[in-house]
Design a protein with these regions (language model features):
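A short, well-structured beta->alpha microelement
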Residues: 417-441
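A conserved amphipathic helix/loop scaffold
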Residues: 451-658
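Aromatic-lined substrate-binding rim segments of carbohydrate-active enzymes
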Residues: 47-120, 197-214, 455
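Polysaccharide-binding and catalytic clefts of secreted carbohydrate-active enzymes
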Residues: 116, 127-131, 135-269, 273
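Short, acidic/polar
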Residues: 41-55, 125-132, 227-238, 304-312, ...
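The substrate-binding groove and active-site-proximal loops of carbohydrate-active enzymes
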Residues: 32-42, 67-80, 110-126, 151, ...
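Hydrophobic targeting/anchoring helices
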Residues: 220-222, 228-415, 506-509, 528-530, ...
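N-terminal carbohydrate-binding accessory modules
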Residues: 19-61, 73, 88, 92, ...
Length: 658
């Protein structure tokens, strides 16, 4: 009897240790998994087989959409039986579950609602949160809660909840009729500001409701369509109620600004935005496209096994704690039925799942290396402003023949600069201006690029002046600061940045789809606009301010690279004029369609390189440390390292520990 009691206590201890996961930590080993789609009609045995498949293919996590519609009974109670099958199966196969709240909605609503219709629906959601959290919080399989599926929406719905919230918000944020200098305000971004704030406040409310009943598990959310929606996200504010940040990155839905060859670049930019947004929180890619499109997706595709591998390593190269694919098994009906999956209709693993397994195995075999690697900074950051996207949403012309006048130009420009630097092997950051640390006392050797950010509020003048005065280099490109926060052309009504930039614009001239601009001995392809700086003939103005300098190139050369596809001139120019780390590992020259991230893991250096070109590339590296302990972590056929040279096959990935 005593032996049984001791055994029972031991089992209880193991159960408790397993069930109390706590929030995701930055030093956790990365997780790999896939969404398991639960719906009526599935048997316990079928559900169990999917968790077995995950386990057998190197996966240790999954995400489940907790459909209230499949639980809610006529009397207002909830029957959790169907989802209990999944949690029991996850426990058996040692799979961690991220459970996504998906409150009752129309059966054709593929993504779920982002805001309640009214307070009554919000109250119902609160009761569902209570029921779901109290039912599953002690499950050993539960790892975390996803607040709601993919916050972010094209336009706010006209509902009582939104109308009432907007009325309250306007009391605290009244519109201006006139600026302080007497000019009228004819357009404003009040609705865009409100949408950002209501997103934050509603997500905070959900997190607070969860914490009433569960204070231990991870609280997470996944933004989506980042290149279109980033203006709706205030990541620094989200950090106050989340314990990890995530995102959805579906090439078919979200990468419409890019062609197929550029999807790896888009994934890198997406991951960098989330990494910066997470700050000190851990992050992982909550949804990563795993399978085929038949009738869903805006740009239908099926990822190749090579792309699956590339995307996983890209996110890991941006310090992610892993990725969860959308999805393992197919939904049976409606939009996306029979699509997106990592297994076939017979339940067998596809080549894509096997490819993911190989990456998972490589990480697991080198777990210590991937616990908490840190990107080795180049000293260069590309920053963007939400206000520029807000302005573009009001000014751009969707069907215009010129990309620079269409939606997307204000994010394509920063991404073009990111690509130009990445193709030199440099770790450039991509972050919101509010995520940059302006509290340092010395910015010598640091550079900020502001590329075609058409609206910059006056409140950022002091931070940017501080950065430059303390030794930083600021490169300003394109139509940056054309508008202020009130959509006033400040170059006409009093230029806020005249002291910092060292002048004002005489005029912007629309010249051609593509033309050349000469800058510091470089000939740069330029799209649409040439900016004349008042009082000078050169295309570039260089102004010393305090201990630093401002390089002002008011022509849209980043869009020129994006539109022409020729990034070498922009890359050569940026590297020649911007201070950056001279000791960091980098390429000896520009290599088109070559991506690299270098990280530090303790005393070890980790190099992740991806060749998206169509030919074999032999890449020479600068500043490679001398070591006899090189170890290949992962390599496609035709990829290797010899001396200071990387041999990279087309579509190949090479991961090396130095």
């Amino acid at each position: 009897m005593k032996r049984l009691t001791l055994l029972s206590l031991l089992l209880l201890f193991v159960y408790a240790a397993y069930s109390q996961h706590g929030p995701l930590q930055k030093n956790n080993i990365p997780l790999f998994g896939a969404q398991i789609f639960i719906e009526p009609g599935q048997s316990p045995e079928l559900i169990d087989s999917w968790f077995q498949t995950l386990h057998d293919n190197g996966m240790n996590a999954c995400r489940i959409r907790m459909f209230e519609s499949y639980m809610l009974q006529a009397d207002g109670t909830w029957d959790f039986t169907l989802f209990d099958y999944a949690f029991h199966a996850a426990t058996r196969h040692n799979i961690k579950i991220y459970a996504t709240f998906f409150p009752a909605t129309e059966k054709t609503d593929i993504g779920g609602w982002k805001f309640p219709v009214d307070e009554a629906q919000k109250d119902k959601f609160a009761r569902f949160i209570q029921a779901l959290v109290t039912h599953y919080k002690d499950s050993p399989a539960l790892y975390g809660w996803v607040l709601i599926n993919e916050p972010g929406i094209d336009a706010l719905p006209d509902t009582p909840f939104i109308r009432d919230s907007y009325a309250d918000w306007k009391q605290e944020n009244p519109s201006k009729e006139y600026k302080s200098n007497g000019y009228p305000v004819l357009m404003d971004t009040q609705k865009q500001k409100f949408q950002t704030d209501i997103n934050t406040s509603f997500l905070r409310w959900i997190a607070d409701e969860i914490r009433k009943y569960d204070t231990s598990h991870d609280v997470h959310v996944n933004n989506h369509a980042i290149f279109q929606n980033y203006g709706q996200y205030d990541f620094p504010a989200w950090r106050t109620f989340l314990t990890s940040l995530g995102g959805s990155a579906h090439a078919a839905w979200h990468f419409g600004y890019f062609d197929r060859q550029q999807y790896a670049l888009a994934m890198l930019a997406n991951a960098e935005i989330i990494r910066s947004g997470a700050g000190n929180l851990p992050w992982f890619m909550t949804e990563l496209q795993g399978g085929n499109n038949t009738y869903s997706g805006l740009n239908a595709m099926c990822p190749t096994p090579e792309e699956i591998v590339q995307w996983l390593w890209i996110t890991l190269g941006c310090e992610s704690k892993g990725s969860i694919f959308w999805m393992l098994n197919p939904r049976s009906s409606g939009i996306e039925a029979g699509e997106w999956t990592m297994i076939d209709f017979q339940g067998k693993p596809t080549e894509r799942l096997v490819a993911g397994k190989e990456v998972s195995q490589a990480v697991t075999a080198n777990a210590a290396l991937f616990r908490e690697p840190h990107i080795i900074p180049s000293g260069i950051d590309v920053v963007y402003f939400n206000e520029s996207l807000w302005a573009e949403s009001l000014m751009a012309i969707k069907d215009d023949r010129y990309p620079g006048r269409q939606p997307g130009a204000v994010i394509k420009s920063p991404v073009a600069c990111l690509r130009a630097l990445t193709e030199r092997g440099l770790n450039a950051g991509l972050k919101n201006i509010n995520e940059y640390d302006f509290t340092q006392h010395d910015y010598s050797g640091k550079s900020i690029i502001i590329a075609n950010q058409i609206s910059i509020p006056a409140k950022y003048r002091e931070s940017l002046e501080t950065f430059v005065a303390r030794g930083g280099t600021l490169l300003v490109e394109g139509l940056t600061a054309f508008f202020d926060e009130d959509l006033h052309n400040t170059m006409n009504t009093g230029f806020t940045f005249e002291k910092l930039f060292g002048g004002n614009i005489s005029e912007f001239i629309l010249k051609d789809n593509l033309f050349d601009v000469k800058a510091n001995g470089h000939t740069l392809p330029t799209h649409l606009w040439y900016g004349h700086i008042a009082g000078q003939q050169d295309a570039v103005g260089v102004h010393t301010f305090g201990k630093g300098q401002v390089i002002w190139l008011p022509s849209t050369v980043a869009l020129g690279a994006f539109v022409s596809g020729d990034y070498r001139p922009l890359s050569d120019y940026l590297v020649s004029v911007l201070p950056h780390s001279t000791s960091a590992i980098s390429f000896d020259k520009h290599y088109s369609n070559m991506l690299m991230r270098t990280l530090k893991a303790g005393k070890e250096t980790l190099v992740i390189c991806i060749n998206k070109s169509e030919r074999q590339e032999n890449v020479l590296l600068n500043n490679l440390p001398e070591t006899k302990n090189r170890k290949i972590i992962y390599a496609n056929t035709g990829c290797n390292i010899t001396g200071d040279k990387l041999m990279m096959s087309p579509e190949g990935v090479l991961v090396v520990q130095l």
